[in-house]
Curated annotation (Swiss-Prot):
A motif (Nuclear localization signal) lies at residues 307-323. Pfam families: Homeodomain, LIM. GO terms for molecular function: chromatin binding; DNA-binding transcription activator activity, RNA polymerase II-specific; metal ion binding; RNA polymerase II cis-regulatory region sequence-specific DNA binding; sequence-specific DNA binding. Residues 328-356, 396-406 have a biased composition (Polar residues). This is LIM/homeobox protein Lhx2. Acts as a transcriptional activator. Stimulates the promoter of the alpha-glycoprotein gene. Transcriptional regulatory protein involved in the control of cell differentiation in developing lymphoid and neural cell types. CDD domains: homeodomain, LIM1_Lhx2, LIM2_Lhx2_Lhx9. Gene3D superfamilies: Cysteine Rich Protein, Homeodomain-like. It is found in: Nucleus. It comes from Mus musculus (Mouse). The gene is Lhx2.
Length: 406
């Protein structure tokens, strides 16, 4: 369209009419703004008013401008304050304390879940590491002392929401944790202990610090315990009562580091049980000596103890039960042998015992003459000669001797 044949006022009138038509026909570009349902629009600017850009502060003389957070912006001035991304073509933008953010930077800085190490936001699509109720970036899940990155399957410990690797957590439990702990020294000590174990210097090399490993893996006996033949119908009940009898006024202690070698300098960690906890565990032990994971979960809810503590208690109770069974078996064998010796069993050779059982009785027999009651009694003594009766010859003289007493 050429405007050279028109005068000045007519040209301005035509331009204004074209602007009004463009304003009515041009679609508004809007986007929802977080926390306020504010729209970011790009209307055409009218000639009767002058708008100031909220970004640069200058006058907006462009045909179109952006409206965000109830402010006007140049299309080039609406940017993220962090990454400087131009938000002209973005669907959404976010405002916080007067600053404009893109979606990624806003969630990174002001999201609900934050990394417990760097305290920065965690994106919903990002892989994380979880420990208890805390969430970490993959690169932030490291040991507090040596900054060793921990991955899935590594052993670690936590104290006061701080993460430690296995070596430094053991040193922390031992109570000899220095201010600047050298990770290389601990690794060298562990290697030396492993070499000593391979050389046959003892089993303590497996754990140079002599401390338990709280890695969630129990040392409970696998499967059901082997069944033993009971010496009597009431032996199981008697052994159970003997194994689990204790004074109700005293608290029973559980040695949690029993499966591991103990050190003289290390104080043994013990767990004290309350009376209702002991009664619950004993009553269940009378029903089942080796509870499974489901039973342990129910017992943990009733007693308030952890599954690890319950596993160790049942393991110790089974060991006591077996020891008492063996003790009762040995006591029964000793009593049986003593009773046999007291009955007066003949101690002669086996041949003499068998011959004596086959030979006539050696008890003296009295014969009375019924024809002469007044005569003295004639006593004959039958004397048994050791030997087999079947071995005597048929013509051998009788071994019975008649003694005339008058």
């Amino acid at each position: 369209m050429l405007f050279h044949s028109l005068s000045g006022p007519e040209v301005h009138g035509v331009i204004d009419e074209m602007d009004r038509r463009a304003k009515s026909e041009a679609p508004a570009i809007s986007s929802a703004i977080d926390r306020g349902d504010t729209e970011t629009t790009m209307p055409s600017i009218s000639s009767d008013r002058a708008a100031l850009c909220a970004g640069c502060g200058g006058k907006i003389s462009d045909r179109y401008y952006l409206l965000a957070v109830d402010k006007q912006w140049h299309m080039r001035c609406l940017k993220c304050c962090e990454c400087k991304l131009n938000l002209e073509s973005e669907l959404t933008c976010f405002s916080k304390d007067g600053s404009i953010y893109c979606k990624e930077d806003y969630y990174r800085r002001f999201s609900v879940q934050r990394c417990a190490r760097c305290h920065l936001g965690i994106s919903a699509s990002e892989m994380v590491m979880r420990a208890r109720d805390l969430v970490y970036h993959l690169n932030c899940f490291t040991c507090t002392t040596c900054n060793k990155m921990l991955t899935t399957g590594d052993h670690f410990g936590m104290k006061d929401s701080l993460v430690y690797c296995r070596l430094h957590f053991e040193a922390l439990l031992q109570g000899e944790y220095p201010a600047h702990f050298n990770h290389a020294d601990v690794a060298a000590a562990a290697a030396a202990a492993a070499a000593a174990k391979s050389a046959g210097l003892g089993s303590a090399g497996a754990n140079p610090l002599g401390l338990p490993y709280y890695n969630g893996v129990g040392t409970v006996q696998k499967g059901r315990p082997r069944k033993r033949k009971s010496p009597g119908p009431g032996a199981d009940l008697a052994a159970y009562n003997a194994a689990l009898s204790c004074n109700e006024n005293d608290a029973e202690h559980l040695d949690r580091d029993q499966p591991y070698p103990s050190s003289q300098k290390t104080k043994r960690m013990r767990t004290s049980f309350k009376h209702h906890q002991l009664r619950t565990m004993k009553s269940y032990f009378a029903i089942n000596h080796n509870p499974d994971a489901k039973d342990l979960k129910q017992l943990a809810q009733k007693t308030g103890l952890t599954k690890r503590v319950l596993q160790v208690w049942f393991q110790n109770a089974r060991a006591k039960f077996r020891r008492n069974l063996l003790r009762q078996e040995n006591t029964g064998v000793d009593k049986t042998s003593d009773a046999t010796l007291q009955t007066g069993t003949p101690s002669g050779p086996a041949s003499e015992l068998s011959n004596a059982s086959l030979s006539p009785s050696s008890t003296p027999t009295t014969l009375t003459d019924l024809t002469s009651p007044t005569l003295p009694t004639v006593t004959s003594v039958l004397t048994s000669v050791p030997g087999n009766l079947e071995g005597h010859e048929p013509h051998s003289p009788s071994q019975t001797t008649l003694t005339n007493l008058f």
